Amino acid sequence: MEFILSLIGSLLLIICVLVSVAFLTLLERKVLGYIQIRKGPNKVGLMGIPQPFCDAIKLFTKEQTYPLLSNYLSYYISPIFSLFLSLFVWMCMPFFVKLNSFNLGGLFFLCCTSLGVYTVMVAGWSSNSNYALLGGLRAVAQTISYEVSLALIGFKILLFSLL
């Protein structure tokens, strides 16, 4: 029974994160519309609130294209795996209700974020383009350098909280 409640809580958390991202993109489009002295997205529904869902429907119904010489499976799996990793990181966040409470949440966070590097590298490699591979390697180098500084800042906070 506890496993089912944990699974339902995790699914509810993922759905809430995805909906909040959709409305943050709507907020971004509204702010950009006001900055550029136009109304922004307001054609769908009441004040454009269903606009992110209409954008998602439009995105999923578009034709899928891929480079001819690419590795088809890894070309499509790597962004999906990256999305799952970013949603999986939310499982270690402490909440008022104990969803998945474990002691090594900080280490789990660092491990999940470091796995995201591989998805970028595989996405660049699987397109069989030298330019995409170089762009993927640059993104990997940048991500690794950011992760090192993030880990050092996290360890510093942990060290000062123990004193």
UniProtKB/Swiss-Prot annotation:
UniProt keywords, alphabetically: Electron transport, Membrane, Mitochondrion, Mitochondrion inner membrane, NAD, Respiratory chain, Translocase, Transmembrane, Transmembrane helix, Transport, Ubiquinone
Main location, first listed in the record: mitochondrion
Task of the protein: Core subunit of the mitochondrial membrane respiratory chain NADH dehydrogenase (Complex I) that is believed to belong to the minimal assembly required for catalysis. Complex I functions in the transfer of electrons from NADH to the respiratory chain. The immediate electron acceptor for the enzyme is believed to be ubiquinone.
Alphabetical list of InterPro entries matching this protein: NADH_UbQ_OxRdtase_su1/FPO, NADH_UbQ_OxRdtase_su1_CS
GO CC annotations, alphabetized: mitochondrial inner membrane
Species of the source: Drosophila guanche (Fruit fly)
GO terms for MF: NADH dehydrogenase (ubiquinone) activity
Cell compartments where the protein resides: Mitochondrion inner membrane
Protein name as annotated: NADH-ubiquinone oxidoreductase chain 1
